[in-house]
Regions:
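Conserved Class I S-adenosyl-L-methionine
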Residues: 209-275
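A short SAM/SAH-binding and catalytic strip from SAM-dependent methyltransferases
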Residues: 130-143
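Conserved alpha-helix/loop element of class I SAM-dependent methyltransferases that forms part
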Residues: 42-60
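Short, glycine-/aromatic-enriched active-site segment of Class I SAM-dependent methyltransferases
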Residues: 163-186
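A short acidic, Gly/Pro-enriched loop at the edge of an enzyme's catalytic core
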Residues: 120-131
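N-terminal, positively charged/glycine-rich alpha-helical extensions of SAM-dependent methyltransferases
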Residues: 1-33
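Class I SAM-dependent methyltransferase SAM/SAH-binding core
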Residues: 63-121
């Protein structure tokens, strides 16, 4: 499926991010913020991953699809802790290669499938999964509702889906909305809210949590960890990129503290269609 120029640029940036994320310095920061022990760019913390595993009722009989799986966090962790089979799907191949090697190192390759693919057109012809998860993925995609429809198509009728997402608070002034967009993922904007999207695409809401405060804590931890490792980060990235990154974190946290953005956790189940 053809990507727009902006989507291609996003993929190229992610490929580079996964390369850099393998650095021991970045790993130390990631572990400090998320407590995960995995290469990755997801904001999911270990406690959040455990919560998602419970919401999805994962066990050794479960088949999990992780969309936007990156380098395997938290999908590999969910599989390791629950014993389920996980299919990791994403577009950037660098992250998937890292995930594949991690699965081999953890001796769980027999329960891990790694696929390069676009969530707008999932490569499965029948309902194949008992659970679907994605972490801060929809806010990085243009075709959000199309992806939700595809998730609905490939999940069992009794399945569960859990996902986190960053979104812009409603009813902002033009100036505040512009400020929110500037510090958000590439495609954070949407014509309708996520509850409406879910209703439109065949899902019913089971549980909802506003996890904005937890995200703000993660941002603060990130800024502190980078401050502690400033010298190493300057050597790794260069002083200009370090300063740009520092300013970006400050602006992001400022927008969240101002109430312009939120991070949400949705747990849903498919609406059963009438025969």
């Amino acid at each position: 499926m053809k990507q727009s120029d902006k989507e291609i640029a996003q993929t190229e940036r992610l490929e580079n991010d996964y390369e850099v994320a393998q650095s021991p310095i970045i790993q130390k920061i990631t572990n400090k913020v998320c407590g995960c022990g995995y290469v990755g760019s997801s904001w999911t913390t270990q406690s959040e991953a455990k919560k998602i595993s419970k919401y999805l009722e994962l066990d050794e009989n479960s088949t999990l699809l992780e969309i936007g799986a990156g380098a395997g966090w938290p999908g590999l962790y969910l599989a390791k802790q629950s014993g389920c089979h996980v299919t990791l799907l994403d577009i950037p191949v660098t992250g998937l290669e890292i995930a594949k090697k991690r699965a081999q190192d953890d001796r769980m390759s027999d329960r891990v499938t790694v696929l390069a693919g676009n969530a707008v057109s999932l490569p499965f012809y029948i309902p194949s999964f008992s659970a679907v998860s994605h972490s801060d993925v929809l806010c990085c995609l243009i075709k959000k509702q199309e992806v939700l429809k595809e998730c609905r198509r490939v999940i069992h009728s009794s399945g569960l889906m859990a996902f986190t997402v960053i979104s812009i608070q409603p009813d902002l002034s033009d100036q505040d909305r512009k400020q929110a967009i500037q510090v958000s993922p590439d495609f954070v904007e949407s014509e309708v809210d996520y509850r409406t999207m879910l209703e439109n695409t065949g899902w019913t809401l089971i549980s909802y949590e506003d996890i904005t405060e937890e995200f703000k804590i993660s941002c603060q931890r990130m800024m502190l960890a980078e401050e502690v490792l400033e010298e190493d980060l300057r050597d790794l990235k260069g002083s200009m990129e370090f300063e740009e990154g520092k300013e970006a974190w400050e602006l992001k946290l400022k927008a969240f503290n101002k109430g312009l953005l939120r991070r949400e956790l949705f747990v849903v189940k498919p609406i059963k269609y009438q025969n």
